[in-house]
């Protein structure tokens, strides 16, 4: 637990100004670590600050769950590396030790031994022999030894997992034509095959159930004595030590809830954690989505299913936040017009919602990031994921503006626009409008995109299987892109200029066709759902608009550029693709989804890829970014009563992770 301070000058300090704030913290491998401001935290009431503090503590307790979900050996490897880093007494200035430090930093970034985005395993730049020497130099009491395990046995166990490229090569495998369960290194399944998993959950599903639970969401599926068994994540079940600690902090947080509705949200989450009952999870989700009046809000639990190649099992995550009241006026305009957007979308009428319910949207300030939202974090969230809850109770959509601020501020003057944009026209638009249009596209994506459309009766929400995440992200992106160019945007005052949307169109197409390739390793295909979606959209509209030269890929001075000649026709193409992708989603057309994703979203243009990597390298830009959290401390007065919560922005990347491993490491090494 973070320490206590006696009341003094640290309390109620104003948020540092943008121009005085140091956003960049660390840089290693392909990663830059940033910090983010928490504007207006000082304006919250004491009760709200206390609520944030205790929800933050609950968030930090779940860190080890996500490590273990990503691979069963992650905790063992991380704890071994941390023991070496903290206790090695030899030469700490050698290149080998530098490489080990970088590897440990990458493990923290990926919440395990795989890259958070590409899903590929990190291969250390130091030798197995060097690693063995270091581990053997550490006192056995400092190492994560299992009962009866020697140091040599530990080394023998984890060396191939770390160093052999053929062992656990991919965290979540999405490749066509293989068993996705057996070829994925994650820890959601053990000893089972993809057909067994599909049959196991297929039997549970009732096509006539209009309010199904999210089968398999909070469990690990294993085979024991020939039988398939779910090990449930709950108090008394799998991950009980961490979940019990989360519950303990949630019980403290309840006392500071802003209102009875929020109290009900927190207590229903506690009930779910205690029982593991997915009906209680639905109850929590409904209460959460219907709490619109609380300024402080949070997500805590098994939420997103991107890490499961079959899209059923959820990773643990948490974000604690509070509403940015001024910026939320933008999203409230969007929410208020949700029915208009649904009615005027270019999709077939049978796939539209007749009545759009409960689309609530807000702009938030993140106070803490945890689990699958840390160190890498989303810039927008739309929950819950349950289709029937969204249909009957609505969804809650957020744009995380202090995170986008950190990205934007850290990117100023980095040379990217000069290197990759076609002309001063595109650069000028980006300078004037990109920050606004990027946030607006996120608003539209989260608030309207994910909330739009409907499944036809009897369609299985998991019908698209491994392609479901990509199709869903493409659907939401296209909805946002289509409406970015609608005159309604300026009519509603969401954009200040009728050409402002072109900044987002250019940025999106350039990224999808070209610049996002910096995130792909040489000779690899695209695996991550959001990247597949962006390339799918960009290449589809490029191909379909080729006759009219809507988009051109041109060479100048031996460099490749994207040129958009007709923004209005591009918008029409976005609408055509949106209609097709909504049809695929609504009807559960697996083959249609597979064809789109495999034909447009997966394969990489290799010569262009090599060029993009070289151009990025010259700019010294990190293609990925992660974050460190602020540190919150309870301030007590002379009567030992909490008088404030202070916030500090000085903790470094290494110090933060070592502290988290010391203070929030509840799980055993082997779970």
Language model region names:
Residues 435-448:
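Short alpha-helix carrying the canonical HExxH Zn2+-binding catalytic motif
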Residues 45, 259, 469-486:
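An active-site-proximal "capping" alpha-helix that borders the catalytic cofactor pocket
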């Amino acid at each position: 637990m973070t320490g206590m301070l006696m009341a003094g000058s640290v309390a109620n300090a104003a948020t540092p100004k943008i121009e005085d704030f140091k956003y960049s913290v660390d840089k290693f491998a392909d990663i830059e670590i940033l910090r983010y401001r928490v504007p207006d935290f000082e304006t919250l009431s004491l009760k709200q600050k206390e609520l944030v503090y205790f929800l933050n503590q609950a968030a930090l307790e779940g860190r080890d769950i996500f490590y273990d979900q990503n691979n069963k050996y992650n905790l063992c490897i991380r704890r071994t590396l941390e023991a070496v880093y903290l206790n090695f007494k030899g030469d700490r200035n050698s290149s080998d030790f530098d490489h080990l430090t970088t590897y440990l930093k990458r493990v923290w970034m990926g919440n395990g031994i795989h890259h958070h985005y590409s899903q590929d395993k990190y291969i250390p730049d130091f030798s197995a022999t060097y690693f063995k020497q270091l581990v053997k130099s550490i006192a056995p009491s400092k190492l994560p030894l299992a009962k009866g395990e020697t140091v040599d046995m530990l080394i023998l166990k984890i060396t191939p997992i770390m160093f052999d490229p053929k062992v656990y090569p991919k965290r979540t495998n999405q490749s066509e034509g293989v068993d996705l369960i057996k070829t994925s290194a994650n820890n959601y399944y053990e000893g089972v095959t993809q057909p067994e998993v599909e049959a196991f959950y297929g039997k549970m599903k009732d096509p006539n159930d209009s309010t199904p639970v999210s089968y398999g969401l909070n469990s690990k599926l294993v085979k024991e004595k020939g039988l398939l068994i779910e090990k449930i994540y709950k108090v008394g079940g799998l991950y009980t030590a961490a979940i019990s600690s989360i519950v303990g902090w949630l019980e403290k947080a309840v006392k500071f809830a802003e209102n009875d509705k929020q109290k009900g949200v927190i207590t229903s989450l506690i009930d779910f954690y205690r029982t593991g009952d997915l009906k209680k999870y639905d109850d929590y989700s409904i209460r959460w989505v219907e709490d619109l009046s609380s300024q402080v809000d949070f997500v805590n639990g098994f939420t997103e299913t991107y890490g499961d190649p079959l899209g059923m099992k959820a990773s643990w995550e948490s974000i604690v936040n509070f509403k940015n009241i001024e910026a939320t006026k933008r999203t409230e305009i969007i929410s208020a017009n949700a029915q208009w957007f649904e009615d005027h979308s270019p999709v077939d009428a049978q796939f539209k919602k007749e009545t759009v319910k409960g689309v609530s949207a807000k702009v938030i300030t993140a106070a803490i990031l945890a689990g699958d939202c840390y160190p890498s974090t989303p810039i927008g969230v739309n929950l819950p994921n349950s289709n029937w809850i969204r249909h009957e109770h609505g969804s809650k959509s957020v744009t995380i503006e202090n995170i986008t601020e950190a990205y934007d501020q850290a990117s100023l003057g980095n040379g990217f626009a000069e290197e990759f944009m076609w002309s001063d026209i595109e650069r000028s638009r980006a300078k004037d409008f990109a920050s606004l249009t990027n946030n607006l596209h996120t608003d539209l994506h989260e608030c309207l995109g994910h909330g739009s459309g409907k499944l036809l009766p009897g369609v299985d929400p998991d019908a698209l299987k491994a392609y479901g995440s990509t199709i869903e992200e493409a659907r939401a992106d296209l909805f946002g892109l289509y409406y970015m160019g609608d005159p309604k945007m300026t009519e509603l005052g969401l954009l200040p200029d009728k050409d402002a949307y072109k900044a987002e169109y250019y940025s999106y197409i350039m990224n999808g066709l070209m610049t996002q390739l910096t995130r792909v390793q040489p000779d690899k295909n695209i695996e991550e759902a959001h990247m597949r979606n962006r390339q799918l959209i960009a290449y589809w509209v490029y191909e379909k608009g080729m006759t009219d030269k809507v988009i051109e890929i041109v060479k100048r001075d031996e460099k490749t550029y994207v040129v958009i000649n007709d923004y209005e026709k591009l918008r029409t193409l976005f609408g055509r693709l949106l209609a097709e992708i909504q049809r695929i989603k609504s009807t559960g057309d697996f083959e249609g989804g597979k064809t789109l994703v495999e034909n447009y979203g997966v394969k990489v243009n290799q010569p262009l890829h090599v060029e993009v990597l070289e151009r990025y390298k010259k700019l010294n830009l990190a293609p990925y970014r992660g974050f460190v959290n602020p540190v919150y401390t309870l301030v007590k007065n002379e009567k030992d009563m909490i008088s404030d919560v202070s916030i500090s922005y000085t903790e470094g990347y290494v110090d933060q992770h070592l502290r988290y491993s010391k203070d929030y490491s509840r799980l055993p090494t082997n779970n």
